[in-house]
Amino acid sequence: FDGRCDAVVLTTSDEMPGDSLDEYRALRARLLGPETPVDKGEFDFVVVGGGISGICAALAAARLGCKVALVQDRYVLGGNNSSEVRVGLGGQINVDPYPSLGYLLNEIGPDRIGNARGAHHYQDDKKLKVVLAEKNITLFLGYTVTEVEKMGDTIRSVVAVEATEQNRIKLSGKLFSDCTGDAYLAAMAGAECRMGREARAEFGESLAPVEADGFTMGVSIEWYCEDWNTPCTFPDSLDWGLRLDEYTVEPVHRANWYWEVGMRDDQVADAEKIRDYGMYVAYSTFSYCKNRYSKKEDWTCTHLVWVSHVSGKRESRRVVGDYILREQDLTRPIRHEDETCTTTWRIDQHYPMEKNSQQYPGAEWLSEGVLTPIDFYALPYRCFYSKDVRNMFMAGRNISVTHIALGSTRVMRTCGMIGEVVGMAASVCMKRNALPRDIYTTYFADLQELMRKGTGRTDVPYTQFYHQVDRTGHQAEDR
């Protein structure tokens, strides 16, 4: 199922090309000639990543007068909230101290909640329409940033490659924002990043482990099936599938957030392996229910409608800023002079489900959440720019937080407001001929003025009502 390859080479010789990226690029250059990236010009603000945070960063900056490039490696916008992944939006918007933040997210957010629903549920067209309406945004869909050109500790340009035709483009900019989730831009630019759990002693976090490790929250491969009027068959997984029985199978029609894999793997280096295992579990489960389950007659007319081919990620690299948000900031709470948008989600840590760990040690696929209450907390601006790369912001789940604090800040409505703040900060930088750190040291009052106003429209229907519990299932909506 879902077999794939990166490239097809047709040849009359017995010579086999290598599998590495460098060998592939050398072969392509030899066959097609060297390719110089097409120069797409200079932008005020280059946003890499077209998920919720990237969209909001681009929109906010564009509405405040910046010339913006928005680069997205998929052909749809929305990231985890797109029809490719289908995760609902979590968290609250429009809360103090800057209640105007979030109206921008309301413009692009779907008007329905829930995970793993039909494609229309996630309203990809709504997001795209709002972005295309902004004359200051140039959108590059299907482009992956693969190279970074720096001058000292400043990014000058990026090179991006289009997925299907392998066309290469060059985007120069004064300011950049890493909204990739996995912090790809930051890593290529040499910014310090973290991944995994910090030791308890490093920040004094009571929820942290005694020793640091590489454990992360995992990814969810969403899927669902439906009961139709027509019977159908599905290949029996007895010879190829996951070992399942009446005790270990999870006979559900829809995978929700707790179908989670890859917690013990490297979320960047092992991304393909993690995704494949999640799909393997999905197909194996459906096959077992169709062919060997004791109640398989109930599944006679059940059709597997959709399996995500893109991982719904929660955590990977986090970029280190001038401040690293920690558990105590959220639970005491500790206020900072550079407070911005507010995180409202509880500290939501995921771990392998104990029973599932016993059944599949080291290869778990079910998780459980451990929730720690917080007070609503305004995030410090210093968490939104790199301490190393002078002209790079970040927005989304890759901001400057510990593993524990990420449990609260990672949900998408919060990430959207972070993006809005970053877009505002970029506009202040352009107005003042400043860099991201200068906003904190010198021009924070300018940012405050913008945050009081917001950049979202208030004359459109308000659809982003908060639900801590998903009314369509027995588990929380977006975890």
Regions found by a protein language model. Name each.
Residues 1-37:
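Extracytoplasmic
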Residues 32, 36, 80, 104, ...:
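Flavin (FAD/FMN)-binding glycine-rich loop and adjacent Rossmann-like elements that form
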Residues 39-51:
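Beta1/beta-strand and adjacent pyrophosphate-binding region of the FAD-binding site
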Residues 44-46, 69, 393:
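Conserved beta-strand elements of the Class I
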Residues 54:
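N-terminal Rossmann-fold NAD(P) dinucleotide-binding loop
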Residues 60, 66-67, 72-154, 194, ...:
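Conserved N-terminal/central alpha/beta ligand/cofactor-binding core
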